[in-house]
Amino acid sequence: MISNNKYDYIICGGGATGLLLSSALISDNFFDDKKILIIEKEAKVDNDKTLGFWDSKETILDEVVFKEWEYAEFKDSEFHNSFLLNPFKYKMIKSSKFYSHLGEKISDADNFTYLNATIENIDQENKIVKTDNGEFQSSIIFSSIYDDKEIKFNKYPLLKQHFIGWTIETKDQSFDDNKITFMDFSVDQKNEIRFMYLSLIHI
């Protein structure tokens, strides 16, 4: 357990949201003298996700971008359109590179502490985070941890959205890897809303 359990800021969750927030705090001199704790259940090292985002400018993640596209297409069974994304680009990052890139930045920050622990409770009123490795206090607590209680008690209709992806290799260059396909609705809808992305990479 960490002996000094009081921090200026605690970040609960070391996924994309927590790491990007940590990076932003590190980049701002205002936080140089602030003690910051980031808590994540397990070390993030595997390539367990594919991250995609739009941007029209350089970002702190550009050096780990695996692929980017300037052209895109949209289609369904009766419609097809290709277009230039300018001034935007769509960028793709492998999560293992994302974790290591921002993880190194956090490790180099003297005012940051990274703790692998399971969060058991977040008390926002008293500003206490309880984990299986002790309790920690902070003036401000950030949390990106999913809480299904918010879903269960929401009175409005909710839609569940989930994605699954495959990596497909072809012997021939069967696709245009300069173009990304967004929302291909030509697939069987099966009384739902279904679409496909095609993120094409020439190896």
Language model: regions and residue ranges:
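N-terminal Rossmann-like FAD-binding beta1-loop-alpha1 element of flavoenzymes
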Residues: 5-37
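A conserved beta-strand/loop capping segment in the N-terminal third of enzymes
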Residues: 55-116, 122-124
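Predominantly flavin-linked oxidoreductase catalytic cores and closely associated redox partners
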Residues: 113-201
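Glycine/serine-rich loop-strand microenvironments at binding/catalytic pocket rims
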Residues: 1-11, 115, 133
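Short, well-ordered alpha-helices that flank and scaffold nucleotide-derived cofactor binding pockets
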Residues: 23, 27, 104, 200
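Short, solvent-exposed loop/turn segments at secondary-structure junctions
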Residues: 16-17, 43-45, 147-149, 188
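N-terminal FAD cofactor-binding segment of flavoenzymes
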Residues: 24, 28-30, 37-78
